[in-house]
């Protein structure tokens, strides 16, 4: 009789636990749904810190298959918007590792390039004009190659048009940086260095406005070195580009 009572009590406890677990799962699901809708509204209203708080709550609930990819994507976007680039990058790496074939992986790669553009702008605006030649546009270069790869790998992405605009901006940014270095060499009468840097600019950024200015400094450098034939050829190229 005692054994039967023990089994009966165990069955009641087991059923109670099963019901409790089911109710807890349902509660978490309802809570996560509520928080997810709330954070979507917060993102729309640009309340990014509130959105991050709610998204992290959902993530910490460890809900199985509850829009985990969307939660991570929204977190990446929110961290990017509040300029928490390190955390955004960390989440990007986690996303790429977990969802390498995701339908919206192009969005993740595009945001990654935007983070590097933002990091470059942050550094660029903190550098005095006289010190620009000393700065290293590492993030601009990184973003440039990321976007080139992006445009090649995802030609049909909805972000391609913006990516091409960003590439145009980066070409201008990097060509002007190189031109600043070239000017520094010129004013210090390092004419060979001017010519070498000029050739690099013309090779990398031939379609930019910096290319014409580069030719002018190269022409002056060849004249200073008394290499008149080459200076004359460059002068003709400059005139042709004015037409």
Curated annotation (Swiss-Prot):
Subcellular location, record wording: Cell outer membrane
Coiled coil segments of this chain: none
UniProt-listed Pfam families: YfiO
Biological process terms in GO annotation: Gram-negative-bacterium-type cell outer membrane assembly; protein insertion into membrane
The keyword Signal belongs to this UniProt entry's keyword annotation: yes
InterPro entries, alphabetized: BamD (IPR017689), BamD-like (IPR039565), TPR-like_helical_dom_sf (IPR011990)
Keyword Cell cycle: no
Signal peptide: 1-21
CC terms in the record's Gene Ontology section: cell outer membrane
Keyword line: Cell outer membrane, Membrane, Signal
Role description: Part of the outer membrane protein assembly complex, which is involved in assembly and insertion of beta-barrel proteins into the outer membrane.
HAMAP family: OM_assembly_BamD
NCBIfam families in alphabetical order: OM_YfiO
Quaternary state and interactors: Part of the Bam complex.
Family: Belongs to the BamD family.
Protein name: Outer membrane protein assembly factor BamD
Organism: Buchnera aphidicola subsp. Schizaphis graminum (strain Sg)
Gene: bamD
